[in-house]
Design a protein with these regions (language model features):
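Helix-terminus/linker motif at the lipid-water interface of multi-pass membrane proteins
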Residues: 1-14, 83-90, 146-157
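Transmembrane alpha-helix boundary and packing residues in multipass membrane permease domains
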Residues: 2-3, 20, 39, 80-81, ...
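Interfacial/gating helices of multi-pass transporter permease domains
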Residues: 5-24, 91-95, 159-164
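Small-residue-rich hydrophobic transmembrane alpha-helices
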Residues: 13-76, 110-124, 128-129
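Hydrophobic transmembrane alpha-helices of multi-pass small-molecule transporters
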Residues: 25, 140-144, 174-178
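Hydrophobic/small/kink-forming positions within alpha-helical transmembrane segments
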Residues: 32, 73, 137-138, 171
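Short alpha-helical transmembrane segments in multi-pass integral membrane proteins
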Residues: 41-107, 154-181
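Alpha-helical transmembrane segments of multi-pass membrane transporters/permeases
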Residues: 64, 119-146, 160-167
Length: 181
């Protein structure tokens, strides 16, 4: 998102770079939980214990879901407060807050989808997990191009467009993960 915004506005690029630090922190928690789920899940997959895999998945989903929901709610309702952690008042806070209000919900979706993609990986469907994740990244880039710069009849939306592109890509990723699990 930030890279593609660099061609339009340096403030937008910097603000989104700062705003995505929130997602980076959330991603670290998600990574830790999915790592634990994958280790335990792989062991139970080897034992053909699908009931335990299901139990581990539910625990991981609840843990990631609650953490990601908390982050999404903060981003939606307190984005200025979050941005002030990284920047003083001004355009960085304003642009970053606008981005977080939209993209914040995608953080919930990303966390949940990572749980589903992890289950695909441990049940011998790692290729499908990679295709879904990679396709979501490609879709995000294409939608960034459309929404940030205003192509194909859409208005140029700048940082808000980057957030919208991220949200749409994560919705598609989650749906694909659920339908494939």
């Amino acid at each position: 998102d930030a890279f593609m915004l660099g061609g339009i506005d340096q403030n937008a690029m910097a603000a989104v770079s700062l705003a995505t630090q929130i997602q980076f922190l959330q991603s670290m928690v998600v990574f830790a939980i999915t790592y634990a789920v994958s280790i335990l899940g792989a062991q139970y997959w080897g034992k053909n214990d699908k009931e335990s895999i299901s139990k581990i998945f539910r625990i991981g989903l609840r843990s990631i879901g609650s953490t990601s929901l908390f982050v999404a709610l903060l981003c939606t309702f307190c984005p200025e407060m979050l941005m002030r952690i990284f920047a003083e008042e001004g355009p960085m806070v304003k642009i970053g807050a606008e981005y977080l209000r939209i993209a914040g919900f995608s953080y919930l979706l990303t966390g949940v989808s990572q749980c589903y993609l992890t289950i695909l990986k441990i049940t011998n469907k790692a290729d499908l997990s990679a295709i879904i994740g990679g396709s979501a990244v490609i879709l995000n880039i294409i939608l960034n191009y459309i929404f940030i710069y205003g192509h194909f009849g859409f208005p140029a939306m700048g940082a808000k467009g980057a957030a919208l592109a991220t949200l749409i890509a994560r919705i598609i990723e989650l749906l694909a993960g659920i339908l494939s699990s």
